[in-house]
Amino acid sequence: SEMCIRDSYCEIYSDVDGVFTADPRIAPGARRIPRISYEEMLEMAACGAKILHLRCVEYARRENVPIHVRSSFSHKPGTWVCDPDFAKEHEEMPGMEEAIISGVAHDRSEAKITIAGIPDSVGRAARIFETIADAGINIDMIVQNVSQVMNGRTDITFTLPMSDSRKAIESLRRLQGELGFEDLLYDDQIGEVSIVGVGMRSHPGVTGTFFRAMASEGINLQMISTSEIRISIVVSADQVDDAVRAAHTAFGLDAEGEAVVYAGTGR
């Protein structure tokens, strides 16, 4: 995407008409979002929405520079990423969506590692994640199973970029003697699906709606992670598309007409 900085805002040109409620190639009912907050866009970018780079949104929020994402191929208005104060000062700004959820993001570039049979004692988890950090690897979700009473061992599962997985496994293998774990399990046939929206703060039923939509499609949730305005799940890779569509429909985001993608990738 190209960038053009004007006096008061930054224009970013892409091959789509702006930021959409989901990837239009997966959810045909995806709609352009007229306006979205920095914090929601940060979550969307971190969870796989490729249209804006995470660092670009972080910089814009820090400097309070509104971003206008639009298509190089049309004169249609795009998506404004800005804070509410900027929108109030500019009456021509589109209104915020009333939807509880702003969008559904997905990410197929992650893998999952399970460290099985770790002795459940103080400091083991710290040692594991220090080792991974020392290898320069960022991890995403972490789940620790309840320790087994019989043998006092536990399992820790985490997700990380697929491109870093070999380095992580090699680092952990070197520590197997010190940490005393039984096995390392690797799975790259996964995907992460996330719903993002500031409406979650005031609507308690979001988690139930999301999980019910997944259950009705027969989608098994392998891992769950939440922030104040995001819920992310890990599912098997072959269920990512179904999960995106089901979440998009469950939160009433489907539009009547289909989104236009100008023979590009939305990047």
Language-model regions: role of each:
Residues 1, 25-76:
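Polyanion-binding loop/helix "lid" in catalytic or ligand-binding cores
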Residues 3-5:
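Short, small-residue-biased leader/transition segments that mark boundaries at the very start
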Residues 78-267:
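A conserved regulatory-domain signal marking ACT and ACT-like small-molecule sensing domains
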